[in-house]
Amino acid sequence: CSLPVLATFHRKLRAEVPLQNRLEDNDRAPWLLARRLLAESYQQQFQESGT
């Protein structure tokens, strides 16, 4: 895993943390959120590298 991807993931995760309160009824919600944000971080990194 590359450091820029993790930095992007961390930034996105911190931006999304307030959403956790609205998703507490779903035990899997934090994992699904983290998985989505990590995927977006990878995608963003590859888009930046490709341009």
From Swiss-Prot:
GO terms for biological process: nitrogen fixation. The keyword Ribonucleoprotein does not apply. Keywords: Nitrogen fixation. May protect the nitrogenase Fe-Mo protein from oxidative damage. Homotrimer; associates with NifD. Belongs to the NifW family. This is Nitrogenase-stabilizing/protective protein NifW. It comes from Klebsiella oxytoca. The gene is nifW.
